[in-house]
Amino acid sequence: MPTIQQLIRTERQRLTRKTKSPALRSCPERRGVCTRVYTSTPKKPNSALRKVARVRLTSGFEVTAYIPGIGHNLQEHSVVLLRGGRVKDLPGVRYHIIRGTLDTAGVKDRRQARSKYGAKAPKS
């Protein structure tokens, strides 16, 4: 516990919050260009081939982003929109690609949770 005299001399340091998505630079989304599209394997108890892309952002960062949904049309030089949000079983993946925007197509034949995958309403 500091004395009052010590507090007068130097005030208490404010706690600084560390952002979970620094590459977005306090923006909700960021545009970027895919430099590499590949698959990655998840951490220990899980097993799959998760689709990820290496993206160079307009903020100058190069990050790894997850491609959600079944099937995608991304390739090198595709322009994508990124949002924050990590993938728990892929270390180092802290961003998601937004489906249905820019060069990213929405998920085909998606009926539930369509807005999250950029899918249009089905023709009834």
From Swiss-Prot:
Q: Which GO terms describe its biological process?
A: translation
What cellular-component terms does GO give this entry?
small ribosomal subunit
Which keywords, in A-to-Z order, does the entry hold?
Methylation, Ribonucleoprotein, Ribosomal protein, RNA-binding, rRNA-binding, tRNA-binding
List the InterPro entries: NA-bd_OB-fold, Ribosomal_uS12, Ribosomal_uS12_bac
Which SUPFAM superfamilies does its entry note?
Answer: Nucleic acid-binding proteins
User: Where are the 3-methylthioaspartic acid modifications?
Assistant: D89
- GO MF terms on file? rRNA binding; structural constituent of ribosome; tRNA binding
Under CDD domains, the record lists: Ribosomal_S12 (cd03368)
Tell me which domain of life the UniProt entry assigns to the organism this sequence originates from.
Answer: Bacteria
Q: Which residues form a coiled coil?
A: none
Q: Which family does it belong to?
A: Belongs to the universal ribosomal protein uS12 family.
Give the protein's function: With S4 and S5 plays an important role in translational accuracy.
Q: How does it assemble?
A: Part of the 30S ribosomal subunit. Contacts proteins S8 and S17. May interact with IF1 in the 30S initiation complex.
Please name the NCBIfam families in this protein's record: rpsL_bact
Protein's name according to its UniProt entry = Small ribosomal subunit protein uS12
Identify the species of origin: Prochlorococcus marinus (strain SARG / CCMP1375 / SS120)
- Per the record, the gene is rpsL
